[in-house]
């Protein structure tokens, strides 16, 4: 059966990762959470007290500490920096609030995009992020751009944080998400924007299963051509 590349882009907490994981599992494809890679880079930068002025040092850290993925017995995706499991630390608020400036560093993006493209070249893949359809996989057969209201996305992040034992303030999350939207869409390198041939889908008020079904139907039509 023909295998394709599925690119899912969108702003923070638009449902990208949740949807992408399910689709990858259903199709037997590789799932790559590119956001986790940038979070891992941010985690490294913060651990070493680096700032936006330290781009070269951050890239050096990435050269010396490989970012890789594993799978827990319950199916949860694990993220490693070197041999250290950073799955949960990279989801903490400090990382979340700093990932935009780290991911805007051209040398960091260049290194991680090259790694993402290497992984994608190995076969069927579902990849989610902010520049997958425009930069990482511009040739992807299916490109989806997910959006949702700031209020709904803040509510999702609020519930997710509480479930992981991370303190959360709903109003503050709304402010942080709106601020991150602005930063991500206005950065000079690979800004958040839909690919010209992406299918837009507003997930506000729509369940995950409906979003998955919509994307899988589009994918099957391409595969069956």
Swiss-Prot record:
ATP binds at residues 10-18. PANTHER family: CYTIDYLATE KINASE (PTHR21299:SF2), CYTIDYLATE KINASE/PANTOATE-BETA-ALANINE LIGASE (PTHR21299). Its EC number is 2.7.4.25. InterPro entries: Cytidylate_kin, Cytidylate_kinase_dom, P-loop_NTPase. It is an enzyme of class 2 (transferase). Keywords: ATP-binding, Cytoplasm, Kinase, Nucleotide-binding, Transferase. One of its GO terms (biological process) is nucleobase-containing small molecule interconversion. It holds the Pfam family Cytidylate_kin. The keyword Phosphoprotein does not apply. GO terms for molecular function: ATP binding; CMP kinase activity; dCMP kinase activity. This is Cytidylate kinase. It catalyses: CMP + ATP = CDP + ADP; dCMP + ATP = dCDP + ADP. The gene is cmk. Transmembrane segments: none annotated. It is found in: Cytoplasm. The keyword Nucleotide-binding applies. Belongs to the cytidylate kinase family. Type 1 subfamily. One of its GO terms (cellular component) is cytosol.
């Amino acid at each position: 059966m023909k295998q394709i590349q599925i690119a899912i882009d969108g702003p923070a907490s638009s449902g990208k990762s949740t949807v992408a994981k399910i689709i990858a599992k259903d199709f037997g494809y590789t799932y790559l959470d590119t956001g986790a890679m940038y979070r891992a880079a941010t985690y490294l930068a913060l651990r070493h007290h680096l700032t936006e002025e330290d781009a070269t040092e951050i890239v050096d850290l990435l050269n010396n500490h490989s970012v890789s993925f594993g799978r827990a017995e319950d199916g949860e995706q694990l993220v490693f920096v070197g041999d250290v499991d950073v799955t949960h630390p990279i989801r903490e608020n400090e990382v979340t609030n700093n990932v935009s400036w780290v991911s805007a560093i051209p040398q960091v993006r260049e290194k991680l995009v090259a790694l993402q493209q290497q992984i994608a070249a190995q076969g069927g893949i579902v990849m989610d992020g902010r520049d997958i359809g425009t930069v990482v996989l511009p040739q992807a057969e299916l490109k989806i751009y997910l959006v949702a209201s700031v209020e709904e996305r803040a509510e999702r992040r609020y519930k997710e944080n509480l479930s992981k034992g991370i303190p959360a303030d709903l109003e503050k999350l709304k402010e942080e998400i709106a601020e991150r939207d602005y930063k991500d869409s206005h950065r000079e390198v690979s800004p958040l924007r839909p690919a010209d041939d992406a299918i837009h889908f507003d997930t506000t008020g729509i369940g995950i299963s409906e979003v998955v079904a919509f994307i899988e139907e589009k994918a099957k039509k391409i595969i069956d051509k």
